[in-house]
């Protein structure tokens, strides 16, 4: 039976490249000259932003978003934490969300059932497997999920006939 997987993943190499480009842009920007501001990537899951003030953190957030979009990473996978300020400066943690959570997977399954397509969906950990009798039904399911607006980026893997 034909099937495909619905996943929400971020390419770690592209994420590393985007953070490096954002750091390089900080070095060349006039408003960040002589300022201790930087992005740090931890384990491919958390990006730490640090700067002397919260205003500069907001500017850095715009730089990070632009670099991620330029590298083809959907910014809906980012979860911005609170800006922590003290006398030494300001910091913010940005979490990169990977995988589809149980609640969101149930919403995807409900969306497929609501459309009354001839497909079945199963939740497998942090992915969703969709199976159907015909390839056309699966392509309709992909089109439906692409058109639906979810708060996380979706990719479609393992399309098998």
From Swiss-Prot:
Pfam families: DUF520
Cross-referenced Gene3D superfamilies: 3.30.70.860, YajQ-like, domain 2
One CC-aspect GO term: cytosol
InterPro entries per UniProt: DUF520, UPF0234-like_C, UPF0234_N, YajQ-like_sf
Keyword field: Nucleotide-binding
Family stated for the protein in its record: Belongs to the YajQ family.
UniProt keyword Nucleotide-binding present: yes
GO molecular function, one term: nucleotide binding
Protein name per UniProt: Nucleotide-binding protein XCV3791
CDD domains registered for this protein in UniProt: YajQ_like
Role: Nucleotide-binding protein.
């Amino acid at each position: 039976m034909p099937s495909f997987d619905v996943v929400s993943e971020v390419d770690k190499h592209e994420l590393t490249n985007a953070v490096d480009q954002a750091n390089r842009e900080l070095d060349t920007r006039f408003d960040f000259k002589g300022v201790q501001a930087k992005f740090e990537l931890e384990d491919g899951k958390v990006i730490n932003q640090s700067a002397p003030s919260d205003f500069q953190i907001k500017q850095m957030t715009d730089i990070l978003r632009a670099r991620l979009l330029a590298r083809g990473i959907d910014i809906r996978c980012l979860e911005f934490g609170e800006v922590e300020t003290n006398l030494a400066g300001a910091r913010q943690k940005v979490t990169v969300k990977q995988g589809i959570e149980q609640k969101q997977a149930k919403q995807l399954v409900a969306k497929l059932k609501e459309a009354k397509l001839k497909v079945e969906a199963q939740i497998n950990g942090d992915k969703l497997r969709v199976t159907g009798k015909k390839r056309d039904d699966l392509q309709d399911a992909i089109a439906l999920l692409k058109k639906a607006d979810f708060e996380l980026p979706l990719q479609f893997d393992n399309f098998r006939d």
